[in-house]
Amino acid sequence: MKGKNPVSIPKKYQEILFSIGTYAEKLGTKAWIVGGAVRDFYLGRDTLDIDLSFEGNVDPLAGFAVKRWGGSKNKFSQFSTFRVNLSTGLKLDMVRARRESYPRSGVLPEVTPSCIKDDMFRRDFTANAWALSIMPGSFGASFDPFGAQKDIDAGIIRILHPKSFLDDPTRMCRAVRFAGRFGWKLAPKTEELLKEAVKQQYPLLLSRERLTREFLKINKEKEIKRILEMMRAYGMLQLVYPGLEWHDGLNRVKTVDERLGVMVCSLGKSGEEFLKSMRVKKELAQEILEAWKVSESCHAPLRALTPMQQAVIRAVHPGRKKYALEPCFLRGRD
């Protein structure tokens, strides 16, 4: 049975966070750790990324952190958010507590400054709607207005309100990503609403960039097989790209780039179009494209393949002979 203070801030972060909380108090504002970091602290998982929410101006607090511990800060003015990379290795997303409203589905929200409870309510799932105070007089105190601890203990992914997937369809991808990562399940009502969101094709309301970004996050997950199987079962994969399925070759590669290469090659003739839709860096796209061309061809490559290209082709075509991947240099009229 957990005690009254069920989650604690790791000692290695306490000095920095206590100092930020103390400075926030001097400025007359309240400060909290929010989101996934609190969840991970509770689960005993290490993290170097911490979200902080303030009920006041963030600018001087971001400046204080960089001046005190060194590093850099970048401001994202649309949401008054600062990304602070400290020289200690700790990464802080420092935001103004806010309320969000969505003018229409699939677009970024309109925001207004607000309190910590409203800031919790704008979160994707109850498990991420948990806050810890970093104020001097209440350092580490838990604020759990929507039952985060209870749902984490039960291994449940639960949205906070019925319009959640309509407001932000990226939450559909995050629901299966977190469920796969932690081995959790969707709450019955959340699952019902997700199925309806798939039926209504909510993900297609997103820009291709936002949908791609969420899928590439899934591609980085250790439990990618479990996640893709969930997406297939719910009909979500076909909304990312028609014909996309789990391929056993994904078990035979090690890197995120190789995974993407396997997906491209496993799609056959439509692989090139899928690759273009992913909008990855030009150099990576070209490397995968060359692997796809060899994968689709019955001929040996005209130039030496990179280790990544070889790994992808062997994963998709485990029966292809080694010599078939060696370059064929043409001479004369041959």
Feature roles, as predicted:
Residues 1-334:
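Catalytic cores of the polymerase beta-like nucleotidyltransferase superfamily
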